Amino acid sequence: IIRPANIMDGDYPGKGYEILETDAGKVLIINVMAIENHHFSKETLDNPYLVAERIIEEEGKNVDVILVDFHAEYTSDKHAMGFYLDGRADVVLGTHTHVPTSDPRVLPEGTLYVTDVGMCGNTDSVL
């Protein structure tokens, strides 16, 4: 289970990142959550920008692809994360709204970016 890497305390299952072996090479997947998320307090979540940056610095040299999943409510936060990690992460994907934004693009330093990739789940549901 990959859960937000910036949860500072509590006994939560999983970890905040994983390195997966694929036919294309090693992929580092990082999950971080914006501080405004209503399920956690500011005292519980560390700065997602700095946490993602730290993991990339520690693990990024050992992988072929770096993908960051940023769970946030506001599109402005997701855009900020994309620009913050541009050139350091290969892919930045926003998640939360359940509806894809259909705005894939390549940022100036080469990072692939989508504001929100939508939901993976039940199609016959209210969420």
Residue ranges and their predicted role:
Residues 1-127:
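Acidic, metal/ion-coordinating pockets
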